[in-house]
Amino acid sequence: MDDVAAAAHTSKTAVYRHFADRTQLYIAVCERVAQVLVGQVRVAMDGATDPQAKAAAAIAAYLRLIENDPEVYRFVVHRPLVDRTLGADLVADLVSLIGDQVADVIADQLAAAGADPAPAVPWGHGLVGMVRSAADNWIARPSGMSKDELADHLTALAWTGLSRVAARIKEDAS
C-alpha cells in the first residue's frame, strides 16, 4: 500500500479511506481494467468491416492497452500478494468475458456465411488465450518487437487458421 500511495502522490491513510486492504484495491483495479479493455476491444471490432480486420483490431486494442500501461497490466495479471480467499479469479473472469465476446463475433460471421456457428466458442477462447500468452511473453521478455509487429504476427497466425477452418466447415456443409 506504501507503493500505491506513493504512485498516487497521496498518503497511505488516504488510500485506506477508499480500500480496506490490498485485496480490495486489486479488485477495484481489475474491475476498471476489465471495463476499459472490454470496451476498447468491442469498439475496435465494431469499427472493422471484415472478419480479418476485426481480428486485427481486437488484437491491436489488447496490445495497445498493455503498451500504454504495462505496470497496471502486470499488477492485474500477476496478482500481487492479496488475500486469496477471493471467491473468483478476476483475471480468468476477464479472459472469459473477452473470449465470449470474440466468440459472439465469430459466430455471427459463421452464421452469415451459412456455416455452423458451434465452433465459435472454442475458437474465440483459443484466440484470446493465444494473444494473452504472447502478450505476457512480450511484456516479460522484451525482444525489441514493437506492438504493431506483434499484432501483425498474431493476426496472421489467427487469420490463417480461422480462414482455412471456416472454409473447410463451409465445404463440409455443402
How would you label these PLM feature ranges?
Residues 112, 141-145:
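Transmembrane helix-loop junctions in multipass membrane proteins, especially transporters and channels
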Residues 7, 24-47, 53-64, 75, ...:
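Alpha-helical structural segments
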Residues 74-77, 85, 170-171:
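Short, hydrophobic secondary-structure boundary micro-motifs
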Residues 1-24, 28:
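Helix-turn-helix
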Residues 35-38, 85-111, 119-136, 149-163:
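Amphipathic alpha-helical packing segments from all-alpha helical-bundle domains
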Residues 165-174:
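C-terminal effector-binding regulatory domain of bacterial HTH transcription factors
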Residues 68-74, 107:
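Charged, amphipathic alpha-helical coiled-coil/dimerization segments
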